Amino acid sequence: MKGMILFISCLLLIGIVVECKEGYLMDHEGCKLSCFIRPSGYCGSECKIKKGSSGYCAWPACYCYGLPNWVKVWERATNRCGKK
């Protein structure tokens, strides 16, 4: 019984520590990375380059899952797109 409780506790701890980020990728200007006229699989490739687990075109921008915490993703509160 103690072993089962320890096992479940470890799983919960791993879930907290291995938390990953998700969101819209940004271009060099701080805007969402567009996929409007890109080929199929473009967003998945871009997400993999950023070490994400997967991604897709959430028209019209690339959305990624499983990104490391160092990757900057677009956020409404800190949006700098088109601003100087």
Swiss-Prot record:
Classification via SMART domains: Knot1
Cystine bridges: 31-81, 35-57, 43-62, 47-64
GO MF annotations, alphabetized: sodium channel inhibitor activity; toxin activity
Modification Cysteine amide occurs at: 81
Principal location listed in the UniProt entry: secreted
GO cellular component labels: extracellular region
InterPro entries attached to this UniProt entry: LCN-type_CS_alpha_beta_dom, Scorpion_toxin-like, Scorpion_toxin-like_sf, Scorpion_toxinL, Scorpion_toxinL/defensin
Domain LCN-type CS-alpha/beta, first and last residues per copy: 21-82
Subcellular location(s) of the protein: Secreted
Tissues where the protein occurs: Expressed by the venom gland.
Signal sequence residues: 1-20
Keywords (A to Z) from UniProt: Amidation, Disulfide bond, Ion channel impairing toxin, Neurotoxin, Secreted, Signal, Toxin, Voltage-gated sodium channel impairing toxin
Entry's Gene Ontology BP terms: defense response
Task of the protein: Beta toxins bind voltage-independently at site-4 of sodium channels (Nav) and shift the voltage of activation toward more negative potentials thereby affecting sodium channel activation and promoting spontaneous and repetitive firing. The toxin induces a leftward shift, on all channels tested (including Blattella germanica and Varroa destructor Nav1), displacing a change in voltage dependence activation to more hyperpolarized potentials. In addition, the toxin mostly inhibits peak current of hNav1.4/SCN4A (53% inhibition of peak current at 100 nM) and hNav1.5/SCN5A (71% inhibition).
Further details from the record: Negative results: shows a weak peak current inhibition of Nav1.1/SCN1A, Nav1.2/SCN2A, Nav1.3/SCN3A, Nav1.6/SCN8A, Nav1.7/SCN9A (17-30% inhibition of peak current at 100 nM). It does not inhibit peak current on insect (BgNaV1 from Blattella germanica) and arachnidan (VdNaV1 from Varroa destructor) sodium channel subtypes (tested at 100 nM).
Domain remark in the UniProt entry: Has the structural arrangement of an alpha-helix connected to antiparallel beta-sheets by disulfide bonds (CS-alpha/beta).
Similarity comment: Belongs to the long (4 C-C) scorpion toxin superfamily. Sodium channel inhibitor family. Beta subfamily.
Protein name (database record): Beta-toxin Tf1a
Organism: Tityus fasciolatus (Central Brazilian scorpion)
